[in-house]
């Protein structure tokens, strides 16, 4: 079980010690599955996890749905492939600019890509959408040519937004200060995650207000936070509009935060694992 930051109400990364314990408790396991990063931008020590798994002759599979951009900016957390993972699924449509549903499965040295392709053909359609495939190729080319500068711009806009939002009061737009070397080994600063309980408002309330009153659609809201996904297509004007709307919400809708739910989680009972 991963740790929880009860103040923010977010799940943190898996630690090397937790992976080692899981390996010892499940000697018949053949692979380790990790996220890089989480929805909120939390990154585990993936290099050490890969090293540990490989020492036990296990493969490392990475859910990198929210990490396409990690391959194009050296100032961001390490990508799965650079960390030595065996396979990684990246959702190009999330931060890479391709059409929704389009993703790429990456394989590293030591993985038989032809065999992987054969298994994929047995488990999903062999008549893929050429709209999705062509969008992947176009976005791949765009990132190959302009990825570094595009995500540098995204990082700058996210850091600017973080600073401006924290000056409003009541919000907490968190970033690299969460890094503790274990459960938060690194942080993806392109994620604009904002804690809202200081306003006396749940994240989902702020999410609804942004959409219904300000015509701003962000990624999601939960009990404690909102997440704005800054893309390579966003402009500084879009960031200013978001910051202005959040300032407005603070001024108009702020409530007494007494009695607000905490961010504690209850682990469900696992009857049978997948």
Regions found by a protein language model. Give the residues of each.
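Conserved PLP-enzyme active-site core in the AAT-like
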Residues: 1-178
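Non-catalytic terminal extensions of PLP-dependent enzymes
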Residues: 163-166, 177-183, 188-274
């Amino acid at each position: 079980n991963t740790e929880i930051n009860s103040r923010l109400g977010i799940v943190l990364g898996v630690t090397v010690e937790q992976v080692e314990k899981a390996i010892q408790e499940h000697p018949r396991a053949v692979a380790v599955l990790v996220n890089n990063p989480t929805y909120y931008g939390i990154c585990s020590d993936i290099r050490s996890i890969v090293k540990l798994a490989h020492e036990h002759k296990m493969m490392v599979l990475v859910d990198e749905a929210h990490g396409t951009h990690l391959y194009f900016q050296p100032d961001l957390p390490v990508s799965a492939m650079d960390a030595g993972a065996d396979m990684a699924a990246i959702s190009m449509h999330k931060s890479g600019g391709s059409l929704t549903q389009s993703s790429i499965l990456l394989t590293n040295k030591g993985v038989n890509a032809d065999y992987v392709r054969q298994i994929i053909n047995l488990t999903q359609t062999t008549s893929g959408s050429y709209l999705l495939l062509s969008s992947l190729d176009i976005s791949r080319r765009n990132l190959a040519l302009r990825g570094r500068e595009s995500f540098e711009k995204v990082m700058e806009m996210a850091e600017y937004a973080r600073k401006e939002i924290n000056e409003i009061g009541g919000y907490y737009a968190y970033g690299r200060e969460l890094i503790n070397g274990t459960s938060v080994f690194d942080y993806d600063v392109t994620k604009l995650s904002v804690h809202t309980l200081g306003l006396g408002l749940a994240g989902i309330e702020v999410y609804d207000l942004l959409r219904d009153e300000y015509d701003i659609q962000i990624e999601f809201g939960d009990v404690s936070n909102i997440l704005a996904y800054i893309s390579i297509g966003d402009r500084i004007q879009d960031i200013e509009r978001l910051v202005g709307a959040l300032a407005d919400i603070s001024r108009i809708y702020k409530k007494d935060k007494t009695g607000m739910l905490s961010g504690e989680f209850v682990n469900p009972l696992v009857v049978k694992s997948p």
